[in-house]
Amino acid sequence: MANAYFTQGRAQEWAVFDYYFRRVPDNGGFAIFAGLETVLDYVRELSFSAEQIDFLRQKGGFDEGFLQYLRDFRFGGEIYAFTEGSVVFPNEPLLSVRAPLIDCQILETFLLLTLNHQSLIATKAARICAQAQGRKVFEFGSRRAHGADAALYGARAAYIGGVAASANTQAEVVFGVPAVGTMAHAFVQSFADEYSAFAAYAQTYPDHTVLLIDTYDVLRSGLPNAIRLQQEVLQPLGKRLKGIRIDSGDLTYLSRRCRELLDAAGMQDCEIMVSNGLDEFIIKDLIQQGAAIDGFGVGERLITARSEPVFGGVYKIVSLEKAGKAEPKIKISENLIKTTTPAFKQVWRLYNQAQMAIADVVSLREETIDGSQPYTLFDPQAPWKRKTVQDFHAKPCLQLVWQDGKAVQKRPTLAEIRAYVQSELNTLWCEVKRLENPHGYYVDLSQPLWNLKQDMLDGIAKEMEAGR
């Protein structure tokens, strides 16, 4: 497409593209916007090497002038986006690119794969951590991830979503995600007996001993050996057994029985961690059943978002600039949900006096919502359903993040993004955060934007009718 734009003399024709999604994975009430800093890093380095251009030349089908154009290519547009870590909802632009058409199209694939993947994993992590009710959750999924990049960037997204740490050491090297690890069954099996394995591990890591106790039998072997280790190895060193991990069996029964026996041995401070195919629903059930669990290691169902492994974000043109004038664009479809909302836009989040989010309003870019006057919300699919709100304040969510070849906002740390997620979640009503059958959060259109969309749809309908 970029080559076609160039050969048609449209290399400097500017457009606006919106990134948004149509439904929340797992029928949830919200999503977490993640991956923005990764996109900005890509934009910063985006260029074409001589080898890449030669490959395109040999492949054929590319205009030589276009190949020369790529030699000096740098992204020359603007990017507007929600803050990374924001809670977001369907059918509102999370990121808008305003740039020459070629620039917009070249960004598309990387932008989609990055924001879709990281938003998916961050959203899944937030759901899982919410069900843990303050207990620590660890990301254990690298070995089941869909490749090395998915493991690495998945760990980043999971940390943003709320996990305490990851078993992916490279994620700490690259992003600063705290790395953790425990022993594997192979370590236990490599010794003559379980106790010898535990003793060797404790001698190596006396300050951080966490034992995997289900290699043979949790209650008849693993736990008794763990208690013996505390008494015979760690206690003489002035150390304490940090924890045990159970990776199989009835986790509710085993954790409760282990807790009883640990407490009876004076090991009330020894934590119990579990793993084994966990997700938000299983964690919720374990806690409701009274399981004595202090932490959860969550693997494949987090790192692959196994229950719904696709975040359906799309990237659509909404405006084209000709002779200095913006011309809104709309795509219609047999499926109503796929009809786009035209024009360069802003998203306003409305908060009540208690700082709880009450609705998002998608408006034309030039509109302002300031809360000084009552404001009427309406359902864009059923405009007769209206509600007037007052005593609120409105926050513009799409902020300029890239201009003139550089980022224009201070780069947040990953810990700051993670903390922002929690502050955002605190603005949502419990009904919106319900695991099942959540209340639908309102995303409305402003009256001028709704009018524009309807006028364009009516115009297209008339053209189609006249063309019959």
Predicted regions mapped to residue ranges:
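Short coil/turn segments at secondary-structure boundaries
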Residues: D54-F55, T123-R127, G141, K433-G440
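Buried, small/hydrophobic-residue-enriched core segments of structured protein domains
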Residues: M1-W14, R23-P25, G61-F62, L67-G76, ...
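Gly/Ser/Thr/Ala-enriched C-terminal appendages of enzymes
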Residues: M1-E13, N27-G28, L278-R468
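Short acidic, Pro/Gly- and aromatic-enriched capping/linker segments at domain boundaries
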Residues: I79-G85, A394-C397
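Short hydrophobic alpha-helical runs that function as membrane-insertion/retention elements
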Residues: G181, M273, D294-G297
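Intrinsically disordered, low-complexity, positively charged segments
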Residues: M1-G61
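Flexible, glycine/charged-enriched surface loops at secondary-structure junctions
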Residues: T182, L234-G243, D269-E271, C430-G440
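An N-terminal, globular interaction/scaffold subdomain
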Residues: D41-L46, A81-E84, V88
